[in-house]
Amino acid sequence: MFRDKKIKILECIRQGQIGGGESHLLSLMENINLEIYDPVVLSFTDGPMIERLKEMNICTYIIPTEKPFDIRVWKKVAALLIKEKINIVHCHGSRALSNVFKAAKNLKIPIVYTIHGWSFHEDQHPFLKRLRIMSERFLTSRADVNIAVSKSNMQTGKKYFPHFKATVINNGINQQKFNPANNFKNIRAEVNVCESDVLLIFIARFTSHKQPLSLIKSFAEALKINPELHLLMVGDGDEKKKALKIIKQLKIEHAIHFLPFRQDVPDLLAASDIFVLPSLWEGLPIGLLEAMSMGKSIIATNVDGTKEIIQNESNGLLIETDNLVHNLTNAIVHLASDKDLRKRLAEKAMQTVSDNFNATTMTRKIEKQYSTLILNKNVLV
């Protein structure tokens, strides 16, 4: 099917910090067939993902920029494509694609674009939303293959872009790594939480769309009803300083525990009882899948992507984003007080991930897109 040489793929992503897209890329690199493909990763910032890729002996490059459509880096990207003799460019997210498409098109290298959630949303300022819709329309039209991580992402694309086409390939996770039967570190002892207390966990960037501040306010209300609750918040971001200020004002420092981003996510999840994801929007949240695979009961918002995974009262609790603090408080109180419900939801959540969201299956589907593109574009390897 292929020539003697391996197919060289440049995987491009906006940052080296760990988020959903970066976790997706790590899973792809862990499972890609190295007998056929020779992956190279380009990130536009440094971070823990880069260190993990180096541990995996994946060739990595950093071309520093935090701006989309940054013409200052386009020549550097072109030089990298030529140096590494890249056959396919695979961009994860719009910022990465905006800084790579020009060089790839000039060199006639086919482009795959994975949409990890759109960059435009209903709660944005109308001008900003309009600008981002124009940007996404332009970028998706430059890709030879568009991959949507959820059906809702594909449907949104079709709604806004008349000629938009995409293949849906759901995110998948390493279910051996996120297996509750494994041995784990005692995180509760590290953060001084008793085994008998109910521990909620939030693992995400501290950004407005993840709503960490709403979670803190909701937790404070729930704590008045159930004083044996604790909340572990793991991550970094713009709203972390505000979060620390709010818990001090509310005088609940004893019940909320902060940790920076960490690699030992399975250990963190193993220590918890309830995983909370109060996002305003999602693509197909990998952190949610990891928590479900670890047998955690879920509270999440009824938003695109998430609602393709969670069925309310079946494998988790879905709440509306309208009146979020009130809805989240009620869900926390309800689930924290009902151990049998937590057990039932967790068991169903594990089954959902086992049946539908496997990283190996995801990777094989992406590889099929690569091989089809090579044949259709008659790319010399």
Outline where the language-model segments fall.
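A conserved mid-protein helix/loop that constitutes part of the nucleotide-sugar donor-binding site
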Residues: 19-27, 198-224, 238-245, 326
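Short hydrophobic beta-strand element within catalytic cores of glycosyltransferases
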Residues: 41-43, 297-300, 310
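Helix-loop-beta element that forms the nucleotide-linked donor phosphate-binding surface
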Residues: 54-58, 153-175
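Short His-centered aromatic/hydrophobic patch
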Residues: 91-97, 115
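A short helix/loop element that forms part of the nucleotide-sugar donor recognition site in Leloir-type
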Residues: 179-193
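A short, well-ordered alpha-helix in the C-terminal region of glycosyltransferases
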Residues: 189, 327, 334, 341-355, ...
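Aromatic "clamp/platform" in nucleotide-sugar-dependent glycosyltransferases that forms part
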Residues: 261, 280
